């Protein structure tokens, strides 16, 4: 038998916000303190991104993602410019006096100065983000020091250029750029049908239930960001279903239909395809595996669940 409506009543809600706003404020205060090494003339903005910003976080959601972006230095994408616009851009720009490499080191050193002590080292940076853990803030935080990423569509002689803004960063020990568009992502997600965000939470909670409570030797290895993008490609006629159980199975039907070409699916920002080979794209086979296992859970709910009264999404 299929998953009952009562289970989706548990799965659709948001998790508690365990202090993300307070954590962001304390990081901003640290970066703005007088002894911070960050260049006084640098234009820096700090904001939340990810599930806490997008209102798709669930009970037990992990670290809060905080972006620290250098806007006075940027990585340009100018392939859309014609030759005249490209020449104007080249003539009007120069190498920055304060580089991204300097900035990200300064952010790391500032956070270490503020939160580390001889007896406690909660600030670490080994991968993409600077991690602040061990109770230094109300919630564990991933801080991403990045620079502005600018996609130019025009650079006129008079007037303002047409630009889409994103963010670009490198892991601490890598050279490959990671590029995404969190503000466009947020705006587009907000403009979707009002059921969109709760549907994302349902699928994230269904994934977590499968991994923790389902009688299976398999698991669902599907990052939350990609689930959010996948559901964004579901038509509004399905998202608007008031019955959450009907909505869930109709989404499975739609996404598993032979009529759908998953290679055409966009990310929420619509700035990049969802599936592909870049470091910000998903593999189609992983999405298909997730859908197959969620379908199995739908079809065999009373046979294979382990009987836990699991109240995901309730704080």
Enumerate the predicted regions with their spans:
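Terminal (often C-terminal) interaction modules
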Residues: 1, 5-6, 263-315
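Intrinsic-disorder-associated interaction segments
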Residues: 1, 13-16, 20, 100, ...
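N-terminal regions immediately upstream of nucleotidyltransferase
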Residues: 1-61, 72-92, 96, 313-315
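Charged, low-complexity surface segments at secondary-structure and domain boundaries
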Residues: 9-13, 181-189, 236-238, 273-283
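Catalytic cores of NTP-dependent nucleotidyl/adenyl transfer enzymes across multiple folds
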Residues: 25-28, 93-262, 295
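Residue-level recognition of the N-termini of beta-strands and the immediately preceding loop/turn
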Residues: 42-45, 128-130, 266
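Histidine-centered divalent-metal-coordination microenvironment in nucleic-acid enzymes
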Residues: 45, 51-71, 131-146
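Generic hydrophobic/packing signal
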Residues: 68-74, 111, 115
């Amino acid at each position: 038998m299929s998953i009952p409506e009562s289970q989706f009543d548990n799965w659709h809600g948001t998790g508690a916000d365990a202090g993300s706003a307070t954590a962001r404020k304390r990081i901003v205060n640290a970066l703005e303190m007088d002894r911070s090494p960050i260049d006084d003339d640098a234009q820096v903005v700090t904001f939340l991104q990810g599930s806490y910003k997008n209102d798709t976080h669930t009970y037990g959601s992990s670290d809060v993602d905080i972006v620290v972006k250098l806007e006075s230095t940027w990585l340009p994408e100018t392939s859309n410019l014609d030759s005249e616009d490209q020449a104007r851009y080249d003539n009007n720009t120069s190498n920055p006096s304060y580089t991204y490499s300097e900035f990200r080191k300064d952010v790391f050193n500032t956070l270490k100065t503020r939160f580390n002590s001889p007896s406690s080292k909660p600030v670490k940076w080994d991968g993409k983000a600077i991690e602040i853990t061990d109770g230094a803030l109300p919630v564990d935080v991933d801080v991403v020091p990045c620079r502005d990423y600018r996609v130019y569509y025009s650079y006129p002689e008079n007037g303002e250029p047409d630009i889409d803004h994103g963010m670009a960063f490198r892991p601490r020990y890598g050279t490959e750029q990671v590029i995404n568009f969190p503000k466009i992502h947020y705006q587009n997600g907000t403009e979707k049908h009002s059921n969109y965000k709760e549907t994302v939470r349902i699928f994230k909670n269904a994934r977590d239930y499968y991994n923790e409570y389902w009688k299976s030797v398999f698991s669902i290895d599907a990052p939350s960001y990609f689930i959010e993008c996948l559901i964004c490609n579901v038509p509004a006629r399905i998202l608007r279903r008031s019955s959450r159980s009907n909505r869930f199975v109709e989404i499975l039907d739609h996404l598993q239909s032979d009529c759908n070409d998953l290679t055409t699916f966009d990310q929420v920002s619509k700035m990049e395809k969802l599936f592909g080979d870049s470091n910000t794209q998903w593999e189609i086979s992983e999405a298909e595996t997730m859908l197959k296992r969620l379908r199995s859970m739908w079809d065999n709910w009373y046979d294979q669940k382990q009987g836990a009264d699991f109240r995901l999404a309730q704080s």
